[in-house]
Curated annotation (Swiss-Prot):
One of its GO terms (cellular component) is early endosome. This is Sorting nexin-7. Belongs to the sorting nexin family. PANTHER family: SORTING NEXIN-4 (PTHR45949), SORTING NEXIN-7 (PTHR45949:SF3). It is found in: Early endosome membrane. It is a peripheral membrane protein. The gene is SNX7. The keyword Transport applies. It comes from the Eukaryota. CDD domains: BAR_SNX7 (cd07666), PX_SNX7 (cd07284).
Amino acid sequence: MDMNSFSPMMPTSPLSMINQIKFEDEPDLKDLFITVDEPESHVTTIETFITYRIITKTSRGEFDSSEFEVRRRYQDFLWLKGKLEEAHPTLIIPPLPEKFIVKGMVERFNDDFIETRRKALHKFLNRIADHPTLTFNEDFKIFLTAQAWELSSHKKQGPGLLSRMGQTVRAVASSMRGVKNRPEEFMEMNNFIELFSQKINLIDKISQRIYKEEREYFDEMKEYGPIHILWSASEEDLVDTLKDVAGCIDRCCKATEKRMSGLSEALLPVVREYVLYSEMLMGVMKRRDQIQAELDSKVEALTYKKTDTDLLPEEIGKLEDKVECANNALKADWERWKQNMQNDIKLAFTDMAEENIHYYEQCLATWESFLTSQTNLHLEETSEDKP
């Protein structure tokens, strides 16, 4: 596999092709539908925050009803993400949108920000719902169904502060030791992630710059229509021509605004999501390495008899099983994630290319129509001047 590219045209294995064919031939078995909508602002003496309505419709037997409606704030989504990472350390958990911290609580929650976050949270939950393992997570079910007080009570049942601190200390110690013999396939995976992170971050910067320049171009172009209208008032012989130019500029402005909307709603969010995915993947690799490092330390202790060796063989056996499960989970999820990534990025850029083609065709047709009308007008005037 070529690690220097994440092109969607990379060949797939025969087995994955067979699985894909089977999937396409089977009927849609989706049984969990989630919608995030109706953001609502809450202002207290301590904080200002937004809650979102989450409607869940399902035919699964483990749910007590077929439809649920709850409200959740961003912190609740963070809790869910943390619980999923805790339960499935080497699965690729979908990323949440960043929690922007801006001076002034009210200014932070403008309409564009709220709508962008709503879409990202909607995608986050639906990616979990579509995941073959995460979709059956008990905390995910509780997140979708429990009322606010029930969710708050459930959160308190988690590990205490000292337990979490102990886990953090062990994780840091494992990362400091490092992994001596990381399997080759995970070396390749890590190289892919590093290269992917570089490329997707570069694409993100370029996309943001293109949007910024497009916005500046649009703001300047908007001024030219009124200028030509004012100009026409002082040019009696060019009134119609100048007004037609103003009309062409106005139509091109509307086309530009539509293209900018497509860029901000279709391409930029996809690229940004995969920037966050690249950070998530690095975290997944670290967690996998921590599990292996823990096994390596036990094996080393047994080899050099650094501690009581009576219980070590049993501990090593359990850790070997844990490493194998972690590796298998990551390998399976990796292929699934990579296929989704290739499809998402390909679709985003294809849609953007089609949008650009339509935009330039529309602007070209606008000005060609104007030139044709002016040519016809000139011919009519010429024929009238002839004796």
